[in-house]
Amino acid sequence: MSSSREAVAACRRQMEAQLDKLRALNASEAPAEAVAPELAALQSLSTQLSELSVSKKNKGKITLKTPKGTRDWEPLAMALRKHVFATIERVFTTHGAVTIDTPVFELKEILAGKYGEDSKLIYDLQDQGGELCSLRYDLTVPFARFVAMNPTEYGNIKRYHIAKVYRRDQPAMTKGRFREFYQCDFDIAGSYDAMVPDAECLCVLVETLDALDIGSFTVKVNHRKILDAIFAVCGVPEDKIRTISSAVDKLDKSPWADVKHEMVEEKGLEESVADQIGTYVQQRGGRELIAKLQGDAVLTQNERAVEGLAEMELLYQYLDVYGVTDRLSFDLSLARGLDYYTGVIYEAVTALSAPPSMTAASSDNNDGSEKTKKKNVAAENGELDESTVGVGSIAAGGRYDHLVGMFSGSKRPDAVPCVGVSIGVERVFSILMQRIQEMQARGERSSVRQKEVEVFVLSMGCLLYTSDAADER
């Protein structure tokens, strides 16, 4: 049994290496004759893995399971999901948004180059009739493509979209991390006064999470102009800014020492430059941090930093009117890995968002328990151990002024500026479902019901029965 498991794990590793080789070929736009043999090798490994995964005893039998990263939803879960979707949609429509729908798969060239390092998570489909297609990774890029195709009619629109997206991620099911999952997006496209739509999107985010009764949460806010300016004044080469930004974005999951190691050892950044970056990106606070950065003589020599700080100051003024500034944290470590963001960026987190402490994980790994053995089996099978990850952000978004222009070919890349927010509905659902299960364990009843109940109220007059009344009857 052990040797069979080792063979499966080895085959999985070979497949990952082969996939990396194919991604590198695609990234370098290698000719088809160079890609074909590598693709054939991957298919051969896939067949080999299938044969190894089926024991002689079970050969010919169908394994009843859902694909990795997907699941079925039982009646109670569906009742809760229906409530969550209805609540989110109610908030979106209250702000005047209309809904659209787009194909579940797009032309591969539409999605290519929009997600930075996350592009490797896109599901590519086999060639069908000469068109190379991929499953949509999010709802933002399809929306930008939609606006670019209909600029006259929909160049100025508040839109929401609730639909499934697909990512080749390492799933952690109980943490709301799937390969097939719903996103609930609210976006504003068009030209408005500075920071007005940005403030409304943040207000929508807060109102939605409050309406879902998610509990305590914090909205981390940053600005790509400020972040890029920090990298510039610290001496990061232009061609490394996006990869260094992706490393910084991991500070919510990893300590600074690990992030610095990645920047220096893996990304090739000079250690002195990484240290300078660390003095900035480990800062967080409120409006007072804006004033502090405006007083930084080195940073304010960069024009983009001055613009970004002025926009952040204006954003806080609008959010004061909405009454949500107490939920915000100006966090310079927030980077958002997607390449299309150009301005304000934000994400909402809860106490469950962060992964368990390294200390707890270490003690679990050394206790020799059955739980530890299961973790080791999961590692051998290339699976993610759910006990080592948090829920992650429960909502995120930002400004992406150039995305529509990338599709429309306009001479002005920011001809249709956009800003939006996406609610991580699966992660919200996992938190709410855990709450229901805890209530059931205590013998309490949840307000979420699997069956609809219709209540009829009938008003009946009060008749005082007397002997005369009885005779009349």
Residues of each region from the PLM?
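Positively charged, Gly/Ser-enriched RNA/tRNA-binding surfaces
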Residues: 80-95, 106-109, 140-214, 225, ...
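Retroelement reverse transcriptase polymerase core
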Residues: 210, 215-216, 229, 235-239
